[in-house]
Amino acid sequence: LLDQQVGDAMQILKEKNLLQNTLVIFISEQGTQFAGAKWTNWSAGVKSAMVASWPGVIKPGTETSAIVQYEDLLPTFIDVAGGKVPDVIDGKSLVDVFQGKTKTHHKYAYHVHNNVPEGPAYPIRSISDGRYRLIWNLTPKETYVEKHIEKAEWYLSWKAQDTDQAHKIMNRYKNRPEFELYDIKKDPFEMNNLADVKKYSKKKAELTMELQKWMKQQNDTGADKDRPRAPKNKQKKAANV
């Protein structure tokens, strides 16, 4: 069905003689429905596919390792259409990347996740520079709950296993340290947490500082931002007690 829909869209552009003068971008949603992927800030949960076609501009078959985010799409379309990108818009135009003028785009990528109201508030923030990923679990003393995962049959089978490896995997998913740091080039599945390894203390400090800087710029106060608030009538009752 997906292939057919994409093909139909491209065929319409071709029939209207617009294909050679149109930028087409296809992106996927992030993550698959497996523990350690969707609904997490690990790589498998935040990375997504992106394919672009722009005849005469993008050379067919080319790839880029530039760090880009969804927020870059709007300024890209405005730029391609000849408009001026407002300063208030997040993201940067991808035109230079598409034209092959640069191999880089953003220095860092940022990610946000929370599971409200599926369990205890469990806000997560993360940052990646393309080589290392830092994950900040803001309420590490809580147990992570994700309803979609826990309803899955394979989750129950994992939980029922009495092997050390199965328990290790389940515990890693449900109970997390405050900080996680991974070398995503050497450890693409992010199983070896380097956050407390002295050798990587400078990288941890750098990414933590940059993440906090971005959170401040986004008016993100952290855990308090994600905790669900009581309805106003309950707040009034509590105030009168």
Which residue stretches match the model-derived regions?
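Structural recognition of the beta-strand scaffold that forms the well-ordered cores
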Residues: 23-27, 50-52, 69, 76, ...
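C-terminal cap/loop subdomain of S1 sulfatases and analogous C-terminal strand-loop tails that border
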Residues: 32-34, 81-180, 215, 235-237
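A structural signal for well-ordered alpha-helical segments within the folded catalytic domains
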Residues: 3-7, 68-75, 89-92, 176-179, ...
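Active-site His/acidic residue clusters
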Residues: 30-42, 198, 220
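Long, internal low-complexity/basic segments
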Residues: 47, 161-179, 184-241
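Substrate-binding rim/cap in mid-to-C-terminal beta-strand-loop elements of soluble/periplasmic
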Residues: 7-15, 35-88, 92-105
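A generic secondary-structure signal for well-formed alpha-helical elements
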Residues: 10-13, 17, 22, 55, ...
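Metal-dependent active-site segment of extracytoplasmic phospho-/sulfohydrolases and closely related
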Residues: 1-36
